[in-house]
Structure formats: C-alpha cells, structure tokens
Amino acid sequence: MDKIRVLVVDDSSTMRRIITDVLSADPELEVVGTAANGRIALEKLPELKPDVMTLDIEMPEMDGLQTVPHVKRSYSRLPIIMFSSLTEQGASHTLQALALGAADYVTKPTAQGAAGDLKSTISEELIGKIKALTRSSRPGLSTSASHSVKGAAPLQALALPSTPCVAQIVAIGVSTGGPNALPEVLGRLPRDFGAPIVVVQHMPPTFTKMFADRLNGVSELTVCEAHDGQELQLGSVYVAPGGYHMSLKRDAVTNAVRVALNQDAPENSCRPAADVLFRSVAELYGERALAVVLTGMGQDGLRGCQAISAAGGTVLAQDQATSVVWGMPGAVVNAGLARAVLPLEKVAAGVIEIAYAH
C-alpha cells in the first residue's frame, strides 16, 4: 500500500523538524517535503504531489490565509490541515481558513517550549486527521464546497409547510467539515422554523463562541453559544461551548427545557460529545426528536442515535459524497438508523420535511 504523502509548511524550522519526525515514525506516512512559507509550498506542489498539506497560519511572505485559496484553485481536492493556536485571533484565523477551503485544523500547545505536548498533539490528533482525510475519496464533493460562510450571495431560506411542526427539537452532531456544512444547513432554515435547534460541533474553547457568532450572521435563526441554565426558545440555535458537554433538562417548576453544561470525562475523545446531547434529547423528547448527523471523523453520535431511534425519534444523515469525512454519518447509516441519507445541499429541506411530516 502506498504511503500517504505529506507536505509540511511552517516558518519555524523547529516545528518543521518536530512535525516531520513524528509523522515519519508512522509507517503509513511519508513527509515528502517541507516549506517555510506559502510561496515556497506553491512552488513545490507540482513536483512533490502530496496527498495532504499541513499549513501554519502566521508565516512571512505568504501566510496560511493567503496560501489556502491559491492551493484550492489549482489543487481543489488536496486536503489542507491548519495549525492554529487556542487564542481569539487563532480561532478567527482558523475559521477564515476553513471558510476558504481548508479541511481541518489542530491546535498547538500554548506553553512555550512544550515540545512534548506538541508531539502528543501530532501523534494523537494530526495523524488521525491525515489518515481520515486522505481515505475520503469524496467523488461528489464539489470544488466550491466551502462557499457557505464567505459565499458571494446569502443562502435563500426555504419556505415552511402550512401544517404544524411535529418535531419538538432538532439536535445536530458534526465534526470535521462542520464549519462549512452548518452554514449550508442553518442558512436555509427560516426564522419561523418550529423547533429549537441544539448543536454539538467538535471545537475547542474560544472557537465555539466565534463560530456561533459567524453562524448567526448567515442564518435567519438566532445562533448563540449555549450557557448553563439557558431556556430553549423557538427560532434559536444553541451551540455547545468547547470543553463542555451539553445536555438538556426539564425545569421541574416551569416545565421549560434548559441547557445543562458539565465537564465530565470526554466521550469518544470529545467534549462536547454528540452522544451526551443525543441521549438527553431521546429521554426528553422521544418520538418528537430529530437527530441530524453531519460530516465528521469517528463515531460520536452513534450511541445517541441508537437511543433516539429506540425512543421513537428520527435520524437523518449526510451522504458520503458530500461529507469531508464520512465517519460519524457513516456509522449511523451503517447501523441502519438513518431514515434519510441526503447530500448536504438537501439536508435543510430534509429537516423541514421530517419535522413537519404528519
């Protein structure tokens, strides 16, 4: 089996060496070259023909944000994984890079000289993402799949049927590819959609608040980062904050449904985890629950969808052709839990159809 060819782009020679050493220790990977900035990387691409590129954001001459669109114009199917920092600026730059076409990101340790932490991040996160992204042939993924956040024109919200909404909650789980998939879905749902929406997007702290703000700018619905005790309202979308599990609880006094956050142990190596949210949704809403599983690595959401299905609820999944990685939705589909398997551009219409079905 051919090794996965990786191009490492970073202006720090120390970073290039550490990334190269850790990746090269994996028998399935081969670092075919390195570059100190985007300009050099673009010059090397035709000769090196990598299967995936890792890209730092802050570099001289041509930084990561300048590099991504150049790469995607000529190599639309080359996955780019950004190296980011856990700062507001890092989050902002990373979300911009994802909107421009980067496939995913990993965050660098914040402590100076944390070489050991960096090696752990590379071995535990980056290698898995490289393998997942390069195994995704994605034959139907268009070169413009990342237009949603920065598209030329806003998406047109769909019309609702005249019948009442049957679903009482829509719960969405998503990971890799989510920053471009969620705007596509939420941007097509109208402001008078008849159920609250709760979202788990695998993201670290700092990122989720900024991401929710961006989603709020492309959707007629009100999108916010959820906070503990918040009451669910129609016309609103609640994004789980990074570093916290989100579940739903019914207020014993008012009967309102509220957000409950905790920092219990990660599930599926994730916090927030879709499984945690989905289990609480199954318990509270039963057959009135609709779960939506979008693009993402791993199997988070599978057990939660089993609970929702067992309670009489409905599961919708994104199809393989339009998923950046068909891990999460694929697990649900392969388990026979999905009532509908739809391309990304039809997910919002599918949500409306199921939510308003009688």
Tell where the protein language model's regions lie, with residue ranges:
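Acidic, two-metal ion nucleic-acid-processing modules in DNA metabolism proteins
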Residues: 36
